[in-house]
Amino acid sequence: MSKNIFITGTGTDVGKTYVTGLILKKFKEQGRKAAYYKAAMSGNERRTDGTLIPGDALHVRNVSGIGQPLEDMCPYIYETAVSPHLAAQMEGNPVDLDCVLEHFDRLCREYEYVTAEGSGGILCPLRFDGQKIQLEDFIQARNLGCLIVADAGLGTINAAVLTAEYMKSRGIQARGIIFNHYEKGNPLHEDNRRMCESMTGLEIVACVREGDTDLDMPFDLLESLYTEGEMK
């Protein structure tokens, strides 16, 4: 059975996909069989044949060098750049939680490590019609631990603490925070690091600078954050 983790963020465009690509690259460099998974992906472009390109999955594969087929990375792909629940209302093909879990479980049987990435922040809805499906439904169904990606700049204390506290209230285990767009020596970024650790009780396990092509984090530490979840 694989070891897994879920990558969430303090909001949209904080760099979850960028950081996830660097994480998968680390596993690839260590010779580990690692997979990427995203339940639902919106804001994708079309190929000349009309099919949708899973943009985040393609980015992760290009950055990391993993050989996982794109079609194995995401079961729900939408064109409109909105939350998956709204994209499905506009385009059809709403998310089915059983399908999401079955796809994830298959990857868990085939790979040593599975890194799942969320859409937007922790409260992003996957479906909101006759059925209501949140990201946390997927996380809780497989008892996944989480890493929080946060921007290192202004406003991150509030965003990181609210995210961590919500996860705690829902029984979701946060294993640490990764700062993105971090500038060493920047007084604001350094203070944000101290304050986020103090106010959330979580460690900033890595800081990613603009343009980094590698994750500055010992592999043993990264690997220790992954745990065996529950698979049906």
Model features per residue range: what roles?
Residues 128-136, 161-164, 189-194:
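Charged helix-capping and loop-helix junction motifs
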Residues 128-152:
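Inter-motif core of Ras-like GTPase G domains
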Residues 100, 104-131:
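Switch II (G3) loop of P-loop NTPases
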Residues 14-15:
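Conserved glycine(s) of the Walker
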Residues 165-232:
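C-terminal lobe/tail of nucleotide-utilizing enzymes
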Residues 4, 18-94, 98, 103-106:
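N-terminal phosphate/diphosphate-binding loop that engages ATP/GTP or pyrophosphate donors
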Residues 24-25, 135-138, 158-169:
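Histidine-anchored nucleotide/phosphate-binding helix
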Residues 7:
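Hydrophobic anchor at the beta1->P-loop junction of P-loop NTPases
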